[in-house]
Amino acid sequence: MKNLIALTLLLGGSTLLCAQKPAKTPATYKPVKSEMYRKGWIDFNKNGVKDVYEDPSAPLEARIENLLQQMTLDEKTCQMVTLYGYKRVLKDDLPTPEWKELLWKDGIGAIDEHLNGFQQWGLPPSDNAYVWPASRHAWALNEVQRFFVEDTRLGIPVDFTNEGIRGVESYRATNFPTQLGLGHTWNRELIRQVGLITGREARMLGYTNVYAPILDVGRDQRWGRYEEVYGESPYLVAELGIEMVRGLQHNHQVAATGKHFAAYSNNKGAREGMARVDPQMSPREVENIHIYPFKRVIREAGMLGVMSSYNDYDGIPVQGSYYWLTTRLRGEMGFRGYVVSDSDAVEYLYTKHGTAKDMKEAVRQSVEAGLNVRCTFRSPDSFVLPLRELVKEGGLSEEVINDRVRDILRVKFLIGLFDAPYQTDLAGADREVEKEENEAIALQASHESVVLLKNADELLPLDINSTKKIAVCGPNANEEGYALTHYGPLAVEVTTVLEGIQEKTKGKAEVLYTKGCDLVDAHWPESEIIDYPLTDDEQAEIDKAVENARQADVAIVVLGGGQRTCGENKSRTSLDLPGRQLQLLQAIQATGKPVVLILINGRPLSINWADKFVPAILEAWYPGSKGGTALADILFGDYNPGGKLTVTFPKTVGQIPFNFPCKPSSQIDGGKNPGPTGNMSRINGALYPFGYGLSYTTFEYSDLDIPPRVITPNESATVRLKVTNTGKRAGDEVVQLYIRDVLSSITTYEKNLAGFQRIHLEPGEAQELSFTIDRKHLELLDADMKWVVEPGDFVLMAGASSEDIRLNGTLTVEDYQTRAKAIEAQKPAKRVSASTNPEDAENVLDEKINTAWQGNKGDYITFALKNGAKVDKVAIAFTRDNNLPATFEIQLSGGGGQFLTVYSGTVSEYGKLISYPFKGTTASDLRIVLNDDRVSIAEVKF
């Protein structure tokens, strides 16, 4: 609530200080120089002729080359730099006559965070008049765009970039949970909706490029930016990253720029020395964990932007590495967009890494490596002028410059900047940004991100009718700052946990509130290693909370972290609750009243005492502006929590690195017997494992089936199972599928995530699920660092977490030579036709159930199909005298006697003609193979 008041005062002050044009924002935007704007095209170079690059119907690459040929070196190099927006580097909110004399008179590649109101890092409060409403903001960005279109020689539009990992970073926009919270929803469709809304609101505000998603994989829970990752599984990060990019880039509304490439999130000891140096990983670990998400998101979602990181890997700074930015990113992954540096990454080549002697050498290294656009908090001259000097001196070829500029122009063409450079629907911006439908998705995300960690004796949900007095305390109970951090909306209305509870219980219960303690104490972080006594003021505040708890029916304690303890450059040396939070919790627990602990934080915390003594615990991460409403719904049973952990909770910081996936037995050691005479020397096991999360209801897993059970490396198998809600409440279950390679040429992971689905079931409802297992789940990097699928057995495990496996089965992969030999060794098929096998033909094609062909395990019957027939299902009536379950396979052949399995399963029902579908294939012969004895086929229909 407080931020709305601040925003009103801010805008009121701006009205007095700044000249505002127009006085009233129009409903639509129409540029002034109408002679440039022709019917169906724009005369960007003002020559009166429709050049190829100005023709929307011309091929993309032809438009790029036509424009590139017309550009001077000065114009090309200006495209290779970002200009930070108002109050960052740019001192003007709107274009001034001086702009025609500055560097960007020749254009600019991108302007970042312009007029978005960002105020961090000691900058003065935003005093621009264009921060809100959305229509006025869009109008202002249009005016800036108009300078580049109308007042530069070639009229190349600027790419307006902005942050957006939890909603677009504008003063007002739809505010979602932090990306770590979004990961805990495990909901692909929801993540796509988040991307769609973020991209749509960004474009309506005037932005064309969103720096999202974060594709870093969390591996060290101490790391400050842990709040920004989806989780610690590369498969999950890739799956959600794909959906986020598809949403953002829907209809090319904006470009999505994933970050940070590469090997960024595992710096030594989680320390952040600005350059994020010395990540501790083997080459194979980098590929399996950190490169995997980027590779899949680029290939499967067509991501148009990548931000290069400023760490080194094995002594080579990524931002200066041709191997990473060109050989791998473009050559192997097929990336076709542009690479922008993280802020100051180019400078770090000589100021931090020491691999360049000066700025000019740093520029050369980065551009030769593959960098397209440099981003920094300094004037663009500091990059562009050395770049021009290098070309003129022969230190860089202009062809390298051309290659880099081609990528930049390609993105600008793809997102429509040369066809529609302005956001013309200004009134639409006011309708779209923060509209009711978007806010509903934000609330859904807040609901689905919450994880129930403990619920002893079913304390939750609370009965709103019998709970008459509620004590609420904790530093995060009435805090809203967690929803207003960098990289997302800055001044939205936030419902705190206290406000959510008060609104939910209005007229039904009395809510007693006191803070209890601050987020950290005066000595923090030193107090993590030295036990300072409580001050009188600290003790008095805890005493107030205790007195409230004694009067109440239940105490709700809201603890965790915030901007002081987590975020960029805020890594920790401990995972314990900071400050006096544990002492507050222990004092409340000592009252004997039921206690519910809510955690609002950006990283897993080692809450061992709470796990042992507090009956109910909810993990909410940073739940967005709707977090208080969502948590109140969960506390009182209006929503059943269904989030699952995408990260591991260690019991102690001494276990780190401790994460998923891991190598066999790598996270367990030190003996098994505790005590003075035992051999246990350290704490083992996770406090809460990857995939863990409880519910107010229960779920049963059954009927696992894997057809076919034998495949070749390039074939796929389907895993089927059934999940039933066996409880009394409707709820969500995140069904997880894991895979383990039983025998391999290198050490592989103990288990790896291979699939997941979030489903909603009413009480008693059952749902059949299917997962596809294909090459991406089976391959490994062999001893020669080549991706291969090795023949052998793979165990497939379905369950409610990585440690709560309910069902398992085995899939076998055989190589092509083994398959060919097996086919050749098979006995001749019993071909059914009227001429060669009249008895079989009569028995299975006479449309009579009471006549049948019978076989035993390994027997098969083959049917000749019409030449070139396409078959996608077969109806079969099986019978068996003992009615025991039986399995079978359907195989097809295109000729030459080689058959491939297209269906493997269990007989659904005896004595009835049942249809068994499979992927449609053209074939000449069809075979049914029995896997059990004394099974009869009474009838077959194609």
Predicted regions and their residues:
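Beta-strand-rich interaction surfaces with strong enrichment in secreted/lumenal proteins
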Residues: 755-761, 785, 850-854, 903-906, ...
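Disordered, acidic Ser/Thr/Pro-rich linker "stalks" and the adjacent N-terminal cap
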Residues: 48, 816-867, 877-884, 905-909, ...
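Glycoside hydrolase catalytic-domain context in secreted enzymes
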Residues: 16-779, 790-798, 802
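Short solvent-exposed strand-capping/beta-turn motif centered on an Asx-Ser/Thr pair
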Residues: 709, 724-730, 866-868, 879-881, ...
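Bacterial Sec-dependent N-terminal signal peptides
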Residues: 1-23
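Short strand-edge motifs at loop-to-beta-strand transitions and within beta-strands
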Residues: 757, 765-771, 859-863, 912-916
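Structural beta-strand segments of beta-rich domains
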Residues: 715-719, 859-861, 870-872
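Trp- and acidic/polar-enriched beta-sheet ligand-binding modules for extracellular glycan
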Residues: 880-942
